Amino acid sequence: MIEADRLIQPQVLAQDEHIDRAMRPKLLDDYTGQDDTRAQLKIFIQAAINRKEALDHMLIFGPPGLGKTTLAMIVANEMGVNIKSTSGPVLEKAGDLAALLTNLDEGDVLFIDEIHRLSPVVEEILYPAMEDYQLDIMIGEGPAARSIKLDLPPFTLIGATTRAGALTSPLRARFGIPLRLEFYNVKDLCTIVTRSAKVMELAIDAGGAHEIAKRSRGTPRIANRLLRRVRDYAEVKFAGEVTEDVAQQALDMLDVDQEGFDYLDRKLLLSIIDKFMGGPVGLDNLAAAIGEDRETIEDVLEPFLIQQGFIQRTPRGRIVTPRAYQHFNIITPDVPK
């Protein structure tokens, strides 16, 4: 399991929730980045409003911390409807889902985070609800049991997942709008950091925002978390304003390097370099070497390292790239031809 105190982990921390809520944009025009996704959503939402219909069911997928929950709330705001939120692991029984569905009004949004973790029993109930706006309920037990159908008002299901491949094919096929969120570029993260600083009434210059943005691993949630810790440093050590120099000092103290890596990223890369001669190394061996589970490596650590060109997945296992050697000032070994 990934350690709970990891500053740059993209999963939401309990202490972040109320602060993140205050920083979330409410409308698409205030939403920064994901330009293609934003443009598509504007069209889909306006078309649904013009037809006075519920928006088609939507699946939002991508690495954690990129704004899937925020986007679901924006959709509800833009459509002018209510949103009810839950998560896959919470819906243990069919009755849990039925209770949510029967309390929806016409056009409402039902948001299910971690939808890939729905139990098969709950998923079966979801199929007719999504397709026909009907709920099949079993009344009674044994020979006296009978099925009744309840009509549901048209609604929009928004599912969010970090593992789209883990969804069953029948469930995935029922989403009319699939949206993939990508890591953010530094320019967009600068805009997000500046906006968040304004919400926090924190003075920050362009250099300070850029320094935080480039170490945020392409993830707004991490950018906002780093901003709060840099603010603490600035208030204690300086007059409170976040400049480039202040941000550099704070982030160096927090052990977040220029690439946005912390000790766990460096541990993974150095394990492949030192213990496995640069790779290839299998996922199970790598997980044992760094003391983490497969899911943490695949879902949390690897996506950013692969996207930034520090690791490659090959049929034989993971290998580090020359860029990883350069990051640690290690001479790249000669590869036998």
From Swiss-Prot:
DNA binds at residues 294, 313, 318. Coiled coil: none annotated. GO terms for cellular component: cytoplasm; Holliday junction resolvase complex. Mg(2+) binds at residue 69. Residues 258-337 are annotated as: Head domain (RuvB-H). It is an enzyme of class 3 (hydrolase). Its EC number is 3.6.4.-. Keywords: ATP-binding, Cytoplasm, DNA damage, DNA recombination, DNA repair, DNA-binding, Hydrolase, Nucleotide-binding. GO terms for biological process: DNA recombination; DNA repair. It catalyses: ATP + H2O = ADP + phosphate + H(+). This is Holliday junction branch migration complex subunit RuvB.
